[in-house]
Amino acid sequence: MASEEIISGMKTKMDKTIDLVKKDFGTVRTGRANPSLVEDIRVDYYGTLTPINQLGNISVPEPRMLVISPYDKGIMKDIEKAIQASGLGLQPSNDGVVIRIIIPELTGERRKELAKIVKSKSEEKKVAIRNIRRDAMEDLKKHTEGLSQDEIKTIQDRIQKTTDSYIDKISALTAEKEKEITTI
């Protein structure tokens, strides 16, 4: 296996981890309406747990309001119950046509809790990035035949620099999300 294959495989896995960070951070409530807050909440739809985003349109008509327009009006009560049971602290209101969710202001205490959650998720993903680096280093050790010590060291340095750049990306996303949470 060539060094380029090891590094490109590592980058692919790390890109997926960055996408997971963005998705995880999207589910953290910030006081602003964002469809990702509710789109993955599962609703019992004819015996199948289905995400809300497959049951209707989610729009943001105002900065602190989400509107869900279900395709099937008969499921509105179930969507409402699923949102209330989600643990996000959201109170949906159903007018028979759409479900409106007003996003309440965050308290200072809740902002601190959310910042801790963001840091925790960030640290989990940094560990995942480091594990990907470890796997790449192990792959390199298995395929060192025909490589000089200098070539091996150069490849190890590239793996480390790539890892550092992805950890920096996670740190930047974390700082951005924390700022979003703590900004009133």
Curated annotation (Swiss-Prot):
Main location: cytoplasm
Biological process per Gene Ontology, one example term: translational termination
Gene Ontology terms, MF aspect: ribosomal large subunit binding
A family per Pfam: RRF
Location of the protein in the cell: Cytoplasm
SUPFAM superfamilies associated with the record: Ribosome recycling factor, RRF
Alphabetical list of Gene3D superfamilies matching this protein: 3.30.1360.40, Ribosome-recycling factor
Signal peptide boundaries: none
Superkingdom as given in the UniProt entry: Bacteria
Cellular component terms (Gene Ontology): cytoplasm
Keyword annotations from UniProtKB, A to Z: Cytoplasm, Protein biosynthesis
InterPro entries referenced in this protein's UniProt entry, alphabetically: Ribosome_recyc_fac, Ribosome_recyc_fac_dom, RRF_sf
UniProt cross-references to PANTHER family, sorted A to Z: MITOCHONDRIAL RIBOSOME RECYCLING FACTOR PSEUDO 1, RIBOSOME RECYCLING FACTOR
Protein purpose: Responsible for the release of ribosomes from messenger RNA at the termination of protein biosynthesis. May increase the efficiency of translation by recycling ribosomes from one round of translation to another.
Recorded family membership: Belongs to the RRF family.
Annotated protein name in UniProt: Ribosome-recycling factor
Organism listed in the record: Leptospira borgpetersenii serovar Hardjo-bovis (strain JB197)
Taxonomic lineage of the native organism: Bacteria, Pseudomonadati, Spirochaetota, Spirochaetia, Leptospirales
